[in-house]
């Protein structure tokens, strides 16, 4: 163990000063003095001019600080430094490695579900029609159908709340959740009889919608000119679709440009 040299009387009176507003180390500070220990016998340190500078301006001074500096200097005595050139930054880095002990950094991984975002969820109230002008209507409180409406029957058109949720990052697609407003019925995609199927699920309004929805409720919205497509996040390449026939259920289809209609127009609802 390295022997700590006895501090001079000048240094001890300095360390036990009553001025608590002094700074401990200040490289270019005023009224600084040098303290050179007589037993630093390493010629490389002396030749390169490594010295301890102590300022009269201290903060949080203690004997522990003094001892730490002396121990560091004792360690420096054991460091072999080349004397052929002035001290470089890399040499100082190696000196630090000898003085200080490296400790591992422990990174803690947190579950995103454990955190709740305080920011309100962005949403829009809207109505949809397919490109053949069929409106989406709630039928028997459990099924969504597409049919042409006119006159007073226009009021039957379902009003959706489209919430912008978390999903796969894609610059061309926006993840959303679709809920029939006032009914808390969410469009979801599940596997039934070996085929992706669109259904309505009633959810607790105190919990839903939320930023991180279950994947079956998420649709990737794509805007093409003035029309929209809604692709299932759970089943890629499957889209919310309507039939060309009248009053048929809205379904999940994987055919674009054929008998299935996958393009919709949106109208904001007040």
UniProtKB/Swiss-Prot annotation:
<feature type="site" description="Important for interaction with integrin">
    <location>
        <position position="181"/>
    </location>
</feature>
<keyword id="KW-0666">Pyrogen</keyword>
<dbReference type="GO" id="GO:0033092">
    <property type="term" value="P:positive regulation of immature T cell proliferation in thymus"/>
</dbReference>
<comment type="subunit">
    <text>Monomer. In its precursor form, weakly interacts with full-length MEFV; the mature cytokine does not interact at all. Interacts with integrins ITGAV:ITGBV and ITGA5:ITGB1; integrin-binding is required for IL1B signaling. Interacts with cargo receptor TMED10; the interaction is direct and is required for the secretion of IL1B mature form. Interacts with HSP90AB1; the interaction facilitates cargo translocation into the ERGIC. Interacts with HSP90B1; the interaction facilitates cargo translocation into the ERGIC.</text>
</comment>
<dbReference type="InterPro" id="IPR003502">
    <property type="entry name" value="IL-1_propep"/>
</dbReference>
<dbReference type="GO" id="GO:0071222">
    <property type="term" value="P:cellular response to lipopolysaccharide"/>
</dbReference>
<dbReference type="Pfam" id="PF00340">
    <property type="entry name" value="IL1"/>
</dbReference>
<dbReference type="GO" id="GO:2000556">
    <property type="term" value="P:positive regulation of T-helper 1 cell cytokine production"/>
</dbReference>
<dbReference type="GO" id="GO:0051781">
    <property type="term" value="P:positive regulation of cell division"/>
</dbReference>
<dbReference type="GO" id="GO:0019221">
    <property type="term" value="P:cytokine-mediated signaling pathway"/>
</dbReference>
<feature type="propeptide">
    <location>
        <begin position="1"/>
        <end position="118"/>
    </location>
</feature>
<dbReference type="GO" id="GO:0005764">
    <property type="term" value="C:lysosome"/>
</dbReference>
<dbReference type="Pfam" id="PF02394">
    <property type="entry name" value="IL1_propep"/>
</dbReference>
<dbReference type="GO" id="GO:0005615">
    <property type="term" value="C:extracellular space"/>
</dbReference>
<keyword id="KW-0963">Cytoplasm</keyword>
<dbReference type="InterPro" id="IPR020877">
    <property type="entry name" value="IL-1_CS"/>
</dbReference>
<feature type="site" description="Important for interaction with integrin">
    <location>
        <position position="183"/>
    </location>
</feature>
<dbReference type="GO" id="GO:0005178">
    <property type="term" value="F:integrin binding"/>
</dbReference>
<protein>
    <recommendedName>
        <fullName>Interleukin-1 beta</fullName>
    </recommendedName>
</protein>
<dbReference type="GO" id="GO:0005149">
    <property type="term" value="F:interleukin-1 receptor binding"/>
</dbReference>
<dbReference type="InterPro" id="IPR008996">
    <property type="entry name" value="IL1/FGF"/>
</dbReference>
<dbReference type="GO" id="GO:0006955">
    <property type="term" value="P:immune response"/>
</dbReference>
<feature type="site" description="Important for interaction with integrin">
    <location>
        <position position="173"/>
    </location>
</feature>
<comment type="similarity">
    <text>Belongs to the IL-1 family.</text>
</comment>
<keyword id="KW-0497">Mitogen</keyword>
<comment type="function">
    <text>Potent pro-inflammatory cytokine. Initially discovered as the major endogenous pyrogen, induces prostaglandin synthesis, neutrophil influx and activation, T-cell activation and cytokine production, B-cell activation and antibody production, and fibroblast proliferation and collagen production. Promotes Th17 differentiation of T-cells. Synergizes with IL12/interleukin-12 to induce IFNG synthesis from T-helper 1 (Th1) cells. Plays a role in angiogenesis by inducing VEGF production synergistically with TNF and IL6.</text>
</comment>
<dbReference type="GO" id="GO:0005125">
    <property type="term" value="F:cytokine activity"/>
</dbReference>
<dbReference type="GO" id="GO:0005829">
    <property type="term" value="C:cytosol"/>
</dbReference>
<keyword id="KW-0202">Cytokine</keyword>
<feature type="site" description="Important for interaction with integrin">
    <location>
        <position position="192"/>
    </location>
</feature>
<dbReference type="GO" id="GO:0001660">
    <property type="term" value="P:fever generation"/>
</dbReference>
<dbReference type="GO" id="GO:0010573">
    <property type="term" value="P:vascular endothelial growth factor production"/>
</dbReference>
<keyword id="KW-0964">Secreted</keyword>
<keyword id="KW-0395">Inflammatory response</keyword>
<keyword id="KW-0458">Lysosome</keyword>
<dbReference type="GO" id="GO:0032729">
    <property type="term" value="P:positive regulation of type II interferon production"/>
</dbReference>
<dbReference type="InterPro" id="IPR000975">
    <property type="entry name" value="IL-1_fam"/>
</dbReference>
């Amino acid at each position: 163990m390295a022997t700590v040299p006895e501090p001079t009387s000048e240094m001890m009176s300095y360390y036990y000063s009553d001025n608590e507003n002094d700074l401990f180390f200040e490289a270019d500070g005023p009224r600084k003095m040098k303290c050179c220990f007589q037993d630093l016998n390493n010629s490389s340190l002396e030749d390169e001019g490594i010295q301890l500078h102590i300022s009269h301006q201290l903060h949080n001074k203690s004997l522990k600080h003094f001892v730490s500096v002396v121990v560091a200097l004792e360690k420096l005595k054991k460091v072999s430094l080349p004397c052929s050139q002035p001290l470089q930054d890399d040499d100082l880095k190696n000196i630090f490695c000898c003085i200080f002990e490296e400790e591992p950094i422990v990174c803690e991984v947190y579950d995103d579900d454990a955190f709740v975002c305080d920011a309100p969820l962005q949403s829009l109230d809207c109505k949809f029609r397919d490109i053949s002008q069929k409106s989406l209507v709630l039928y028997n409180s459990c099924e969504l159908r597409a049919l042409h409406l006119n006159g007073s029957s226009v009021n039957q058109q379902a009003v959706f709340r489209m919430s912008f949720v978390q999903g796969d990052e894609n610059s061309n697609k926006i993840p959303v959740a679709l809920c029939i407003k006032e009914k808390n019925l969410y469009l979801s995609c599940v596997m039934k009889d070996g085929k992706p199927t669109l259904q309505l699920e009633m959810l607790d309004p105190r919990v839903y919608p939320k930023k991180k929805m279950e994947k079956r409720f998420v649709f990737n919205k794509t805007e093409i000119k003035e029309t929209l497509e809604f692709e299932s996040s759970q089943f890629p390449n499957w889209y919310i679709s309507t039939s060309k026939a009248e009053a048929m259920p809205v379904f999940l289809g994987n055919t674009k440009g054929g008998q299935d209609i996958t393009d919709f127009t949106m109208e904001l609802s007040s």
